[in-house]
Curated annotation (Swiss-Prot):
Keyword vocabulary terms for this entry: Ribonucleoprotein, Ribosomal protein
Keyword Heme part of the UniProt annotation: no
A GO-annotated cellular component: cytosolic large ribosomal subunit
Subunit structure: Part of the 50S ribosomal subunit. Contacts protein L32.
Pfam families recorded: Ribosomal_L17
Superkingdom of origin: Bacteria
Family: Belongs to the bacterial ribosomal protein bL17 family.
NCBIfam families according to UniProt: L17 (TIGR00059)
InterPro entries given in the database record: Ribosomal_bL17, Ribosomal_bL17_CS, Ribosomal_bL17_sf
GO BP term, pick one: translation
Protein name (database record): Large ribosomal subunit protein bL17
GO molecular function per UniProt: structural constituent of ribosome
HAMAP family cross-referenced by the UniProt entry: Ribosomal_bL17
């Protein structure tokens, strides 16, 4: 019996599902809007909203938890420095899902998943700046050794 079992399997093993959610959440944090199938978007929304709620705490334990979930330190940095302050006054509901018709080929229902109150002009620029800063820091550290 399947009583009170939450979540979707999406025809994947548990490890594959968790890896997919981690990768999709990094893409969503980086670009602040992605296009995917509707069931994946519905599964991704609670995953990312929990990450933002944890990031709003802003302590070391929260940072370590986020790194364990999404395994991308640049995405965690953007969560802690950009997204958490943006949603400091909001209690949940950080993400919206917009239906986008059906995919040509297999008629899969598609959807856009995006952050509420996102800055449309700076799509991915903050993430690229963080990435360049970390690369520059690594280069400086290598040169000093």
């Amino acid at each position: 019996m399947r009583h009170r079992v939450s979540g979707r399997k999406l025809n994947r093993t548990t490890s594959h599902l968790l890896a997919m959610l981690a990768n999709m959440s990094v893409s969503l944090i980086q670009h602040e809007q992605i296009n995917t199938t509707l069931p994946k978007a519905k599964e991704l929304r609670p995953f990312v909203e929990k990450l933002i709620t944890v990031a709003k705490k802003g302590n070391l334990n929260a940072r370590r938890y986020l790194i364990s979930k999404i395994k991308n330190e640049l995405a965690v940095e953007k969560l802690m420095t950009t997204l958490a302050p943006r949603y400091a006054e909001r209690h949940g509901g950080y993400i919206r899902i917009l239906k986008a018709g059906f995919r040509y080929g297999d008629m899969a229902p598609m959807a856009y998943i995006e952050f509420v109150d996102r800055n449309i002009e700076s799509k991915g620029k903050e993430f690229k700046a963080l990435k360049n800063d970390s690369r520059n820091a690594k280069l400086i550290a290598e040169q000093s050794n």
